[in-house]
């Protein structure tokens, strides 16, 4: 039996600055996640911050994506080592860490995903990520195959973007446009010129440090603009948004 689970192709694609088009999975359903995995996206965020996800709902979704070319990325609810450890043990290799504001917080996220001496990840010899102990080189390979993407979505995060982007082990910078807009005094209006200028600034600083940048952009014009500005991994929609739009359109068609 071939139990090779490395290398991490999504991590390699980010490092090579290859454009990666993704989608948000927020319905906490293995069926909808499986459908997304068949659609051809390069990566999928399984949201543990704003969606009703936890370990018990995420494992079936990971199973649903087995064999899919779409790389699963988990957004953890908070930058907390025990939560991150549990996500590692169930089989996630790609992490989106919300609300990172300082270099110290970025470094803590990285350390949470690394075994000692590089980090503080707790050791279990048999779990889903190492195929229940059947991957002989898991400990040797894991540290260098984890992807850490940190989310900048506050004024303090913007102020510290250079230090955050320079943090060793951080693979990418992701802009949270809604929270960023709120932090800048434009709640509900991520299209405000001040917000857009700040997004462009974050992209530029990430690029200056050789780090790829990404964003959630469910409006096509926004997504294309961000790609033109240098974003390399962009989530262009969500299962919830697509489901709501299609069902509303269907209802409107027959209820006019």
Curated annotation (Swiss-Prot):
This is 5-keto-4-deoxy-D-glucarate aldolase. InterPro entries: Aldolase/citrate-lyase_domain (IPR005000), GarL (IPR017648), HpcH-HpaI_aldolase (IPR050251), Pyrv/PenolPyrv_kinase-like_dom (IPR015813), Pyrv_kinase-like_dom_sf (IPR040442). Homohexamer; trimer of dimers. The lineage of its organism: Bacteria, Pseudomonadati, Pseudomonadota, Gammaproteobacteria, Enterobacterales. It comes from the Bacteria. Signal peptide: none annotated. The active site is at 50 (proton acceptor). SUPFAM superfamilies: Phosphoenolpyruvate/pyruvate domain. Its cofactor is Mg(2+). Pathway: Carbohydrate acid metabolism; galactarate degradation; D-glycerate from galactarate: step 2/3. Its EC number is 4.1.2.20. GO terms for cellular component: cytoplasm. Keywords: Lyase, Magnesium, Metal-binding. It is an enzyme of class 4 (lyase).
